[in-house]
């Protein structure tokens, strides 16, 4: 009998906002993410540094367990601008692009 393995990635929910307009997060200054999203390491991200923003947006998109997190920490215009550069797990990218096909363009 073969044993099938289920990974955490296979069962972890991917949280997606109902609309991009709901993403009303900050756009200037320093983004301070809470420790329930950033378990260790850097938790402050500078809006003046795209590498910081890419790291912060990836954390929020991958680690959020509640829609309120993506609504609070992501901004629609910033997400649209960064989307082509974001290095996301395939399942996360696919789920967001299914919900918002305009991101794939």
Residue locations for each model-derived region?
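Long, compositionally biased intrinsically disordered regulatory segments in eukaryotic proteins
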Residues: 1-105
């Amino acid at each position: 009998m073969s044993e099938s393995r289920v990974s955490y990635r296979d069962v972890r929910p991917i949280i997606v906002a109902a609309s991009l307009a709901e993403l009303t997060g900050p756009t200037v200054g320093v983004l301070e993410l809470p420790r329930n999203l950033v378990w260790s390491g850097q938790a402050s991200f500078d809006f003046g540094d795209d590498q910081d923003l890419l790291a912060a947006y990836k954390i929020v998109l991958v680690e959020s367990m509640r829609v309120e997190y993506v609504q609070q920490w992501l901004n629609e215009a910033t997400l649209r601008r960064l989307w082509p550069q974001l290095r996301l797990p395939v399942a996360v990218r696919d789920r967001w692009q299914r919900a918002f096909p305009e991101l794939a363009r």
